[in-house]
Amino acid sequence: MPNPSKILKHSWNKEDDTLEFLAKPFAEDQSVTKRTILSYLGAIYNPLGIVSPTTAQGKHIYRQACDKKKGWNAEVSGELRDEWIKRTKQLKTVEIPRSIATLIGEITGVHFHLFADANLACYAAAVAVVEQKGSMSKGLLTSRSRISKRNSSIARLELVSGHMAANTAKNLHGALQTLVHQFFYHLDGQHGCAVLAD
């Protein structure tokens, strides 16, 4: 990478003006245990939420390993091991534009689009978008994800994901200290919308 610098511990490629998430590779010959999974997940620094979807999947794998009730240093099943190796490989290719506004010029409006979704494994939220005069620039501002609580209904999890999206937008709005003209909420399922309608 030419002229790399760091922004929030992410590598900044100044020529392409992109941020690249640099994860420590997980050696395929390394033992995959509850201890090594938790250690790897704990070492991931992800303040922008760039890799939240992948870390959520890693946490789900950890939960599945815990369900087997094996010791901390016991090898996980072959299926979980293969899934873990697959997910950690995904972390090597994450790269996003550093700036959402791609044109030099006045920003005429900022619109937050909040996307929320949930399933029985996890729920997540993401926030995007900026508008400039004469064009629309779109990009991911941040994302968050959590492992779903056990025995929760889809309707409840969709509401929780929508609430997380709203809280994320509120915190982001305060941090940016800029006027947001509109907020758009996109819930991916009908369960949460039906509950809100009632």
Where do the language-model regions lie?
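C-terminal reverse transcriptase regions that engage the nucleic-acid substrate
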Residues: 2-106, 111
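A short, polar/acidic, helix/strand-boundary loop motif
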Residues: 131-160, 164, 193
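Alpha-helical hydrophobic packing sites
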Residues: 11, 46-51, 119, 160, ...
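Secondary-structure capping and boundary motifs in well-ordered enzyme cores
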Residues: 33-36, 104-111, 115-120, 153-158, ...
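An acidic- and aromatic-residue-enriched active-site/binding cleft used to recognize and process polar
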Residues: 13-15, 24, 118-121, 128-130, ...
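RNase H catalytic domain
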Residues: 164-198
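Acidic, metal-ligating active-site segments
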Residues: 7, 110, 114-143
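Short coil/turn segments at secondary-structure boundaries
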Residues: 24, 59, 126-128, 197-198
